[in-house]
Amino acid sequence: MKRTIESPRSVLLLYEMSRNGITEVSMKHIYLNLKRFDVPVELGGVNRLAPVPEWGKVIVEKTQGALKQYDPAKVEFVQFLPEAHLLTAVAALEENSPILLGSQGVFRDNTAPGGNFGAFTTNRPASIVRALGCKATLIGHCEERNDKKGILAEAGVSDMSAVNRLLNKEVKCAIASGLKVVYCIGETSEEQPEWDKVLGEQLSVGLEGVDKPQVVIAYEPVWSIGPGKTPADKDYITKIARFVKEQTGGMDVVYGVGLKSDNAKMLASIDEIDGGLIALTRFQGEIGFYPEEYLEIIRLYLGE
């Protein structure tokens, strides 16, 4: 996030100055989305790391020591875990740990004194996410967007902009509970010819009435996800990141479709990109997430 800058116009001015080599004052954001990598291999998952009850704790323990070498004024590390692992992960945090923990989403409604006291069966209100020890949440990930689109389609709803309105409620609930938000946007292959319209609506509707300094944008080129798909190249990512900054007054933008060892240096070379979202660290052989590979990706991206 940009430092000591108040208004969106001044943030955008600082971004333009940075592009022209005049100055640069930015925070890097390294996010980790652990999805459901906790599912054991014998059940169809990719977890070879630890027994399920210890999985979240092990990840924190194997990463927080090495991350202490980085300046917390220059880079933040947030790990987004499935809810079942948050308590053990929080318990594993050392004093002054460089790791912040986050949830993989929040519900669009919340508890409140004198209001709903917790009638949210199956749902995850932002209040409990904060109470569990989380500092951030992930909202609008392409997998969440696809789920919401599927539910709306089953209900016969053709207005897919409703997804952005639902996500806007989630963002507001998260911020009201004191959580930072990583808000994901992205276009499918069908939407790519009108990428600017699609992304513009995701930004304008999803962030309507939102306290933007509490939000970082994660860009997911959904059309590039999956085996055999061509990854977005540097020029395309740069174009989108510039568009997002121009539309939002200079909000921070991270690459959301896998910061990994083979693209870390390329992404680090893009001035408009402020970090990335790591997920799987190994894509062949024993596919999965491995803490030592996560740390190597960070080293490659930060150049340290």
Regions found by a protein language model. Name each.
Residues 105-160:
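Glycine/small-residue-rich loop that forms an oxyanion/phosphate-binding "nest" at active or ligand-binding sites
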Residues 13, 21-101, 108-114, 218:
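Conserved N-terminal beta1-alpha1 strand-loop-helix module at the mouth
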Residues 259-272:
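Catalytic cores of alpha/beta
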Residues 154, 283-304:
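C-terminal helical cap(s) of enzyme catalytic domains, especially alpha/beta-barrels
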